[in-house]
Amino acid sequence: MDDEEGNATLIDEISVLEARRDVLLDELKSLDNATLSDLVQKPELSKNLSVNNEFLKETPLNQPALHYDRLSGISFFQPNDPEELSRKTLLVKNKKTGAIETAPSIPLLGVRFDIMLNPVNIGFTNLSENPISSASGMDEELEGGNRFDVPYYIIFRVFHDSFALYKYTIPSFLNIQEWADEYLTGKNPERFRIFLWKVDKLLTAYICRKNALLQINKSLTIDGTNISANLSCTHLVIQIPKVIQATLVCSSESTRVVKSRIYQYSDENWKRDHRLELSLLDNKRWVNILVSHLTAPESHASL
């Protein structure tokens, strides 16, 4: 009799788990083609995914200024689980009952980040005033509409009270693991939205810096010009023989110049240009200022 009752209890628990799994799968399917704004408009989705609805509505404050304008988007999808078949054949021990049973399914949630490749505005009041676009023919490129960079993806494992990184295509030099440890663990599962927000801004800042570097490179046509940068485009070096030697350091979370060291060649000597350095620091128009300065006739008259 005890064995029959034990079996009945085990069957009931398995049924409850299977029902819970089906509910989670249905919820993930409903997220297909959704956007982050949809989560705000559908509190039942955020609640079932253990995301606090009030936190979703809250606009993050006290964040560093992001000196760029971009059109970007975050969308959700349900990816296929490559481990689904292996899980069906995997047996595990139930910690509560001690029974051996099939490994439970852990749902996946996919997030796609789409970032504009070209800036709508990167320090210029309008495109017609942009000396970079005029010098590089970028106005013609923008006439046909803007383009997107390759999309970036993050696949999450969805647990009862938290999320976990499973796979992602974010470049390794953009470290998101620290944010994942802070915002996705069981202690702070309601902060899923802020994690996505921070990753989106990190990617947008990186693409903006990369594009700014490309624009500067296209604009400077002086013979002997050498422009280099690290992978994250936060450390930029510009060298023009007998004209300028400049080292610029940008914030990893924006396009702001946070440190600079610039030497100008004058009277057969290299002299540090403190005025130009100060004009670039924390100035969203620093690309404009730098290119205008370097393309001015007096800047390379010594050549």
Swiss-Prot record:
<dbReference type="GO" id="GO:0005829">
    <property type="term" value="C:cytosol"/>
</dbReference>
<comment type="function">
    <text>Component of the kinetochore, a multiprotein complex that assembles on centromeric DNA and attaches chromosomes to spindle microtubules, mediating chromosome segregation and sister chromatid segregation during meiosis and mitosis. Component of the inner kinetochore COMA complex, which connects centromere-associated proteins and the outer kinetochore. COMA interacts with other inner kinetochore proteins to form the inner kinetochore constitutive centromere-associated network (CCAN), which serves as a structural platform for outer kinetochore assembly.</text>
</comment>
<dbReference type="GO" id="GO:0051301">
    <property type="term" value="P:cell division"/>
</dbReference>
<keyword id="KW-0995">Kinetochore</keyword>
<keyword id="KW-0498">Mitosis</keyword>
<comment type="similarity">
    <text>Belongs to the CENP-O/MCM21 family.</text>
</comment>
<dbReference type="GO" id="GO:0034080">
    <property type="term" value="P:CENP-A containing chromatin assembly"/>
</dbReference>
<dbReference type="GO" id="GO:0031511">
    <property type="term" value="C:Mis6-Sim4 complex"/>
</dbReference>
<dbReference type="GO" id="GO:0000779">
    <property type="term" value="C:condensed chromosome, centromeric region"/>
</dbReference>
<keyword id="KW-0158">Chromosome</keyword>
<dbReference type="Pfam" id="PF09496">
    <property type="entry name" value="CENP-O"/>
</dbReference>
<keyword id="KW-0539">Nucleus</keyword>
<dbReference type="InterPro" id="IPR018464">
    <property type="entry name" value="CENP-O"/>
</dbReference>
<dbReference type="GO" id="GO:0000776">
    <property type="term" value="C:kinetochore"/>
</dbReference>
<keyword id="KW-0131">Cell cycle</keyword>
<keyword id="KW-0137">Centromere</keyword>
<comment type="subunit">
    <text>Component of the heterotetrameric kinetochore subcomplex COMA, which consists of fta2, fta7, mal2 and mis17. The COMA subcomplex is part of a larger constitutive centromere-associated network (CCAN) (also known as central kinetochore Sim4 complex in fission yeast), which is composed of at least cnl2, cnp3, cnp20, fta1, fta2, fta3, fta4, fta6, fta7, mal2, mhf1, mhf2, mis6, mis15, mis17, sim4 and wip1.</text>
</comment>
<dbReference type="GO" id="GO:0000070">
    <property type="term" value="P:mitotic sister chromatid segregation"/>
</dbReference>
<dbReference type="GO" id="GO:0005634">
    <property type="term" value="C:nucleus"/>
</dbReference>
<protein>
    <recommendedName>
        <fullName>Inner kinetochore subunit mal2</fullName>
    </recommendedName>
</protein>
<keyword id="KW-0132">Cell division</keyword>
